[in-house]
Amino acid sequence: MKQIGLLFFIFSLLFSVALTSCDSYIDITPKGKITVDSVSQYYQLIADPMRAYYPSSFILLSDDQWAKESEILGKESTSSDGINFTFNEAADRTILADNNLYENMYKNILRSNLVISNIDDAIGDPTLKPLAKAEARAFRAFDHFLAVNTFAKAYDPATAATDGGVCIVDHYDLEAILPKSTVAAVYDFIIKDLEESVELLQEEPVNIYHPNKAFGYALLAKVYLFHRDWEKAKAAAEKAFALNSALVDYNEIRNAGGLARDTKYSKDKNPEVLSYHWMAGWGSGEEICLLHYGMISPELKNLFESNDLRYSLFFRDNASSMVDWFDYGSGAAIWLRANNNIDRFTYMSVGLRTAEVYLILAETNARLGNLSAATDYVNQLRAKRLSGDYAIAQPATQKEMMDQIIVERRNELLFGFNRFFDLKRFNLEPEYQKTIVRQFPVVNITETYPQKTYTLKPDSRLYIIPFPHSARDKNPNLTLNTEE
């Protein structure tokens, strides 16, 4: 084993991380000096809730999102937000400043590999080593999944073996210059990591920041869903469901007076949460992220039924007190700042929740032709989200069932990566692909900034986010997956 020389002080650690490609380096400066050499210390290293998946490089490509007009107008070619919101394919995205999304994904992978590659030689309880490696592999799979779906094409069985993917980092080596793998190879690696680790995970880990078995199976189900293996996705989702099928009843929250009064699902007490991963790491960073990217589009707003508590509990369209983040009269709605507080309610923008497992079960059953089961899973979820009449009738066709599931995914899986990833995978199917049309601005229409119509086609290269130039400079193998 290489001599590591890494120092840390768990949870009060000051990280100064320079990680800009698959062959990058890490420089950690601690407050307290504790050498990582014991099994327990490596195990603690796995739990890192502040993973910081900043969404600015892609989130405004989603038809679920909206933006304050002053953040876009005049910046249509110079910022990620401006380029994405106006679907500007003529802009050069390769010169944009990095928002650290790629860096943070691979920092997390580096952290996992530090455990996987070195814990066998650590001193301490030998029975903890297999668990630690299994947990680290589950999180390593999670970050590779996010990376390949952000920086490469969606998995297409017909082309995945030749489509450019991302670097696979399967061990701890700070000096390696790694090749870029294909999309198929990355998925094979992710699936292998999960299949070999999930049964070793605990049903109830030491704390909420360690992955449990329900998370492992839910992630495996999601990976198989994106891999278009409906039977295996369904089987994994059923195992996750058997371990945790809890849903928060939003009717109870409403009846108790709302989230200001009913705080029993705050912090680590939301039974739906399977993994604690946010867009910016919890705290002021996530608050700003949800303010900046917490505005939903008029289209998504109109998809919520009048009795849908997912809207009435969490959003407002007359948020005059949030004028810095919201354009009144735009037709959009914004996430209530008062609810953006872990002391009131824990909402996962990136991490997995049981609600997503219900939706995976609905989709896989629909894909396999069992519309009755698909309808039942959708209605079980809606029973906890809508007041009054919540049930949908069983659709007559698979297409109608899938259309309903897609709407439920949009209403339930807000922010983070979900809609962006869904658009990419559904755009591979003629029945479900979508051309997004956006008219903008709505409020501040002037001679300088007239209202225009912007269009994003299903095969747009904008759906593949370019690797940051800092990563490409460090690793010549990391060629772009787009022609730009």
Protein language model annotation of sequence segments:
Residues 43, 50, 227-228, 234-354, ...:
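Extended ligand-binding clefts on enzyme/binding-domain cores
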Residues 81-151, 181, 199-204, 344-349, ...:
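Conserved, well-structured interaction surfaces
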Residues 22-67, 300-305, 313, 389, ...:
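Membrane-proximal, proline-rich intrinsically disordered regions
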Residues 32-37, 63-73, 153-162, 203-288, ...:
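Short, surface-exposed recognition loops and adjoining beta-strand edges that mediate ligand/DNA contacts
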